[in-house]
């Protein structure tokens, strides 16, 4: 079977956006997981920013990974991927000019699409970790991203955190990003179908949801009718890999103590030590959670 080119995969992603169906992402974090996802029939994969931070730095999701580190991992995946890969490009690694550099590098890495979010990252002195940038700045980032791409088949998706906004504020932001030319809108933190319906009726571009398995949004047919084309349930595959590695090595060492039989969540916490970063952010930056 002939291999798909990067542009082929970008067109395949656009076909998903143009379809009438809803597709769930596979969490791909290295070349092997990308090959597995494609072989199992997943239509789309995602390289999450949080997962890249774990994989490359063994660090929690505090915007610590650099653009070059993220691009290197995306490039490794892009060499072998035979499914469209969506890159979670966080805040674009800086201002609108940095966003342009991010788009250039990720396009060369071979991703099919990328998200740019409007969270104020990295955390700023004296601000909340969930604060958003002004909508005007977010619009500038989307416009800059569109200007920077060479291959027009690369999809640029604007992302916002619905969990920290009123429904009215979500509508204003998402409509602004749609008007700026975003190929799709990604939202994290949508509570339920009632809220989604209120937002969706104001938008015409395809939608992407990061649900983390929210039980109030588990109806693919209903999601599809509301324009949702991509759903990110989370990154279970990555955490399962951590758990499998731990269990295998623990068995090799003959450590059968039940107290050491940790869950994937416990393992992630143990080996990334997020409480240290929270303490440092509060102590050195006066960042409020």
Curated annotation (Swiss-Prot):
Its EC number is 4.1.1.112. It comes from the Bacteria. GO terms for molecular function: magnesium ion binding; methylisocitrate lyase activity; oxaloacetate decarboxylase activity. The keyword Magnesium applies. It catalyses: oxaloacetate + H(+) = pyruvate + CO2. Signal peptide: none annotated. It is an enzyme of class 4 (lyase). Binds 1 Mg(2+) ion per subunit. Substrate binds at residues 50, 159, 235. Its cofactor is Mg(2+). HAMAP family: OadC (MF_01299). Belongs to the isocitrate lyase/PEP mutase superfamily. Oxaloacetate decarboxylase family. Homotetramer; dimer of dimers. This is Oxaloacetate decarboxylase. It comes from Pseudomonas putida (strain ATCC 47054 / DSM 6125 / CFBP 8728 / NCIMB 11950 / KT2440).
């Amino acid at each position: 079977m002939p291999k798909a080119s990067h542009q082929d995969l970008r067109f395949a992603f656009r076909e998903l956006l143009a379809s009438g169906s809803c597709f769930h992402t596979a969490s791909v974090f290295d070349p092997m997981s990308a090959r597995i996802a494609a072989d199992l029939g997943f239509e789309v994969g995602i390289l999450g920013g949080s997962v890249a931070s774990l994989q490359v730095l063994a660090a929690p999701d505090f915007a610590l990974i650099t653009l070059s580190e993220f691009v290197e991992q995306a490039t490794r995946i892009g060499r072998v991927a035979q499914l469209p890969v969506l890159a979670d490009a966080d805040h674009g690694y800086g201002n609108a000019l940095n966003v342009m550099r991010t788009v250039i590098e990720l396009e060369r890495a071979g991703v099919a699409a990328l998200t740019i979010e409007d969270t104020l990252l990295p955390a700023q002195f004296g601000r909340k970790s969930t604060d958003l940038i002004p909508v005007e700045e977010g619009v500038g980032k989307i416009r800059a991203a569109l200007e920077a791409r060479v291959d027009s088949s690369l999809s640029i998706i604007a992302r916002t955190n619905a969990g920290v906004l009123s429904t009215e504020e979500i509508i204003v932001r998402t409509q602004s990003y749609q008007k700026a030319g975003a190929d799709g809108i990604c939202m994290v933190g949508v509570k339920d179908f009632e809220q989604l319906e209120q937002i969706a009726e104001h938008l015409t571009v395809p939608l992407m949801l990061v649900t983390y398995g929210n039980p109030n949004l588990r109806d693919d047919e209903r999601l599809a009718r509301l324009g949702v084309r991509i759903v990110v349930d989370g990154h279970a595959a990555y955490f399962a890999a951590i758990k499998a590695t731990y269990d295998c090595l623990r068995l090799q060492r003959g450590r059968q103590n039940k107290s050491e039989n940790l869950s994937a969540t416990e393992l992630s916490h143990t080996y990334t030590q997020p409480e240290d970063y929270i303490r440092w952010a509060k102590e050195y930056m006066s960042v409020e959670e």
